[in-house]
Amino acid sequence: MKLLTSLIITIALAAPLLAQTPTVAEAQAKQELNEAARAYREGKFADAQAHSERALQLDPQNKTAPMFVARTIHAQYKPGDFTPENIAKAREAIIAYQAILSRSPADDEAYKAVAYLYGAIKEDELLREWVFQRAGNVSIDNAKRAEAYTVLASRDWDCSFKITELPAHKVTTVKGDKASVSYRMPKAQAEFERAKECANRGLEMANMAIALTPEAESAWAYKTNILLELAKLAEMSGDVQYKHELQRQYEEALNETTKVANRSKPKP
C-alpha cells in the first residue's frame, strides 16, 4: 500500500513535467507510465514493470521512470519467501534502486529501499557495507550521514548484547530482597571476541555520529549502551580497573544523553 501511494504521488508530480514534453518518444513514455500506474493499481506488478521499462527505453532522460521501474520490481518481492526466484527479484529491485542513486545520490527512498531489501534477504554484510558507504559519503548532509553511523552502532550494540545477556553469561544472585548481576566469560572464546569486536566497533560508529551531529539523541543513547556492553565484557575478562573506567564513561555518556534529550524537548 505504501509503494502504491508513493507511485501515485510520483505520477501526480510528474504530470506537469510530462505534459510539457513535445517529442513523440516522450509522449509515448508518458502513456507507458500511465499504463504502468494502472497495472500497479490492479496488482499486475509484472505488467507494471514492463510498461515502466518501456517508458525508460523511450525516454532515457525521464526523471520518474527509473523509480517506476524500481518500485514495480520491489512490489513483486514477497517478504519472508526465501525461494531463489524471490531472492532474485529482491536483487533485481536493489539494482534498479542503485541505478537511481547513480543519478541522484541523495535519494532517500532508493537508499532506504536497498537497505530494507538487503536486511529482508539476510545479506547482513552487504547491508553493513551499504550503510557504511552512506555514512562515509561526504556529498550527503551530516544529519543523514550521522543517521547511517547510528544504524551501524545499533547493529553492533545488538551483536554484543545478544551475547552478554545469554543466561549462561549473565548470572543473577538474590540475597534477601536484593539481587545482583554479574557476568562470566563464555565457554567459547570466539563468542567473547565477537562481542568485544562488535562493541568496540559500535563505540567508534556512535562517536562518528556524534562528531557529525553533537545533538543526536539516538547516537548518544547508543554510545551509552555500548559503553555498558564494554563494561560487561571487561568484567568477563576480569579487568576490574578497566571496568571501573568504562562505568565512569558510561555515567558521563548517560548524563550527556539526558541533557541532549532535555534540550530537544519543545519548550512550553
Language-model features: where?
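Cleaved targeting-peptide boundary
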Residues: 20-28
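Alpha-helical segment of the N-proximal tetratricopeptide repeat
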Residues: 27-54, 58, 79-82, 187-194
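Short coil/linker segments at helix-helix boundaries
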Residues: 46, 73-99, 125, 141, ...
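Short coil turns that delineate tetratricopeptide repeat
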Residues: 26, 60, 105, 139-143, ...
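Canonical positions in the second alpha-helix
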Residues: 55, 99-100, 133-135, 209
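Bacterial N-terminal signal peptides
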Residues: 6-16
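Canonical tetratricopeptide repeat
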Residues: 68-69, 113, 151, 222
